A protein has these predicted regions:
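Conserved functional hotspots at enzyme active or ligand-binding sites that engage polyanionic ligands
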Residues: 1-109
Length: 109
């Protein structure tokens, strides 16, 4: 697992249905750590470019439909709740996700 991977997750709470998510924690984080920071994805796209990153499906990312990374809803989940790897975001999508995450947590102020 590495940053930018698109995986399936089953997180708890309001967004608990299995869905694609992007690994957003650094690759420098120990692989033995019990949890992983992800941003879940949704196919219900909204007009919120500051914190929702729209990603079109490609063979590389493994998505089936246009989706948005919900940078406004990062979650930490137990490693065992991560399912299979679907694909990986391209460099442009990762760069846009970085900007959105910086906006959400106030690093862009």
């Amino acid at each position: 697992m590495r940053r930018g991977d698109v995986v399936t997750v089953a997180a708890s709470g309001d967004y608990g249905k299995p869905r694609p998510a992007v690994i957003v924690q650094t690759d420098a984080f120990p692989a033995s750590h019990a949890s992983v920071v992800v941003c879940q994805m949704t196919s219900e796209c909204s007009d919120a470019p500051d914190f929702r990153v729209t990603v079109d499906p490609t063979a590389t990312n493994g998505l089936r439909v246009r989706s948005q990374v919900m940078a406004d809803k990062p979650v930490t989940i137990r490693r065992e709740r991560i399912g299979r790897r679907i694909g990986h975001l391209d460099d442009q999508d990762i760069a846009r996700l970085n900007v959105a995450l910086a906006f959400v947590i106030g690093l862009a102020d």
